Amino acid sequence: MSVVPIEPVSRVLLRDQAVTLIRSAILSGELPPGSVVKDSALAGRLGLSVAPVRTALARLADEGLVESKPQSHTRVTPLVLRQVRDAAVVVRAMHELAVAEAAPAVTAADVTAMRAANRRFAVAVATGDLDTALAADDELHEVLLARCGNGAVRATIDRFTPAVRRLERQRFAAAHGHGSVVLHERLISACANGDVAAAVSTTTEIWTALLSELEETPDERS
């Protein structure tokens, strides 16, 4: 009987766990913009060794969520308008492409799932539950990403979304979040009717509304 070798995966799993936990702390504001992060202190809080935490911080630096100064410190990246705008423009383009590819193939089940997600989103925005609002927003757009099936589009969105997530939290915390409910319903209706042009233009409007708020957001770079 052949023996299947056991692969050493624990280090990778710990690294991924550290990335998820630290990213969540940054996006939720638990680690606020500009705050200094020490790998040893984070490792202690997470119950991990320093090695996976350092690897995680390097990955989060690639995502633009932390920045390191050699021989100095690592800190949570301030909300820098140009960087957020650059990322948001890319994410908008990818969502437009995903909708263009997905809309002609949307099923009745897809429409039902999106409408259910938008109902959860509306309730969460109305009650100020930001985490649930963001999760419901992700679920709605995930239906179209899954239907699109373009791995490169998904990878690009996953790569740049963290850079704009903090701005999204500000949007959904304000009255602007209520406008997203209406835009979502327009998007869903366009997909249900097979109106690709309307679905894409509504997606553009959703992201343009977010980009317009950059003009109202203070630059935290110091």
What kind of region is each of these model predictions?
Residues 90-103, 138-174:
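Hydrophobic, amphipathic alpha-helical faces that serve as interaction scaffolds
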Residues 10, 115-122, 169-222:
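C-terminal all-alpha effector/ligand-binding and dimerization domain
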Residues 84-87, 114, 133, 137, ...:
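Hydrophobic packing residues in well-ordered alpha-helices of helical domains and bundles
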Residues 1-100, 104, 211-222:
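Short linear motifs at protein or domain termini
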Residues 16, 92, 108-115, 178-182:
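Amphipathic alpha-helical repeat elements characteristic of tetratricopeptide repeat
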Residues 53, 111, 115, 154-161, ...:
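Short, well-structured alpha-helical segments
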Residues 97-123, 127:
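Amphipathic alpha-helical dimerization/coiled-coil segments
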Residues 128, 150-151, 194-195:
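Short loop-to-helix capping motifs
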